[in-house]
Amino acid sequence: IKRIICGLIIGLVLGLVVPQASVISILGTMFVGALKGIAPLLVFFLVMSALCHMKSGQKTNLKFIIILYMVGNLVSAFVAVIACRLFPVTLTFTDTASATDITPPSGIAEVLTNLLNNLVKNPVDSIVNANYIGILFWAVIFGIALKHANKGTKDALENISDATATAVQWIINCAPFGIMGLIFSTISEQGLDALLSYGKLILVLVGSMAVVIFIINPVIVFIFTKQNPFPLVFTCLKESFITAFFTRSSAANIPVNMELCKKLGLDEDTYSISIPLGATINMAGAAITISVMALSTAHTLDIHVDFLTSIILCVLAALSAAGASGVAGGSLLLIPMACSLFGVPNDVAMQAVGVGFIIGVIQDSCETGLNSSSDVLYTAIADIRE
């Protein structure tokens, strides 16, 4: 963690002092690229290996973890709604050039349909395009099919899985250099001025996420484990949140989370599935972003949103957030769908997406950090509860 902080500080200083030295940003691009490149293989082989070695009748806690993921999404959306009622935000709409080529989903049905279509896509195509729902589906199919394979086949699969995990560890050891490149790129390209005009919106978004991280999640930990929640919460923040914050991709953080689960001594048969699944459907941060941006757009247009509509928004945000899987800025694409609940025209909703891109350097970083660190937290809760 000390090396990562050093990399962060050096990247910040270099971004302010020599912003033209663009070669430094290559370190960040390579780090994120390496994590994204290895993650699909890690998930595929780890899940296959875990399932083919699983004995009949062996228990996992996946059902409970999935329930935690969904509850986390719903509660986070509710926190965002309360925050927007206490601190209503008026948006300053700008040019949406960065969002003009985006086609947002037409509704929750399209989001869920896309999710189901991704489930059965070609397994090779899924690995190449980091389609984690598809990777999980085929890894489970092959893993179950290989349960009756001979010992040599199972050992070979386990060796490949171990080799992939070792490669991941080597990449993670380069995190200080990667984070230095990422923070340099952010500061040199975005600067700090672009963020100041949206200060209140950023505070509401980040504040809502902080409430979930420091209040809601510890309460959930305590309810199910009857232990002091903060050691586990802060371990997840230190080991998972920080790297997710800078990579801004739940998919890229999967190897980091796998390594943390191993360090915590969690059941590999469970976390090898729950972590990549969490990167797809555990989107508490996305639920907050969707809710806050939709309600802020409604407030800007003087549209009154009653309590019942707010509750419907919570459910809609929680469900649709599960479709914003593993993609930096993915939740922004779902803002127009949430805005349609209030009758906001699509062109205006797309302006809200444009605002999201401007503040994305903070919003998306915090959102991904919350999403990804919660994957480990909820998996650990299920393990400790047993």
Go through each PLM region and give its residues.
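Transmembrane alpha-helical segments and their short flanking loops
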Residues: T92, V292-E386
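Active-site-adjacent helical/loop segments in soluble small-molecule enzymes
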Residues: G37-S49
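Helix-loop-helix junctions within the multi-pass membrane cores of secondary transporters/permeases
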Residues: E239-A321, D375, T379, E386
